[in-house]
Amino acid sequence: MLDLSQTIEKVGEKMPWPPKVFWVGLVVYYGFVALCWIGEATAGINHIPTAAFWYASFLGTFLIPLFMSIIYFYFPEKAEEARGGS
């Protein structure tokens, strides 16, 4: 029977911590928000109340999970198929 430390080691072998998808998502999320803030300030429309909240919440709710799932699951699956894997 495995003790807790061996179980944690086995889980760690399969998934790096924190996952790369977390860091990529963090950069995409805050990078997009920063670009939107810069765009608002440059265009002079930064007077819209809670605009940053709404586009950041839209991005975090709908787009980042989609991008991350494509990057982390679709591309590796296609690469595995191209290498002749099952």
Swiss-Prot record:
<protein>
    <recommendedName>
        <fullName>Uncharacterized protein AF_0970</fullName>
    </recommendedName>
</protein>
<keyword id="KW-0812">Transmembrane</keyword>
<dbReference type="GO" id="GO:0005886">
    <property type="term" value="C:plasma membrane"/>
</dbReference>
<feature type="transmembrane region" description="Helical">
    <location>
        <begin position="53"/>
        <end position="75"/>
    </location>
</feature>
<feature type="transmembrane region" description="Helical">
    <location>
        <begin position="21"/>
        <end position="43"/>
    </location>
</feature>
<keyword id="KW-1003">Cell membrane</keyword>
<keyword id="KW-0472">Membrane</keyword>
<keyword id="KW-1133">Transmembrane helix</keyword>
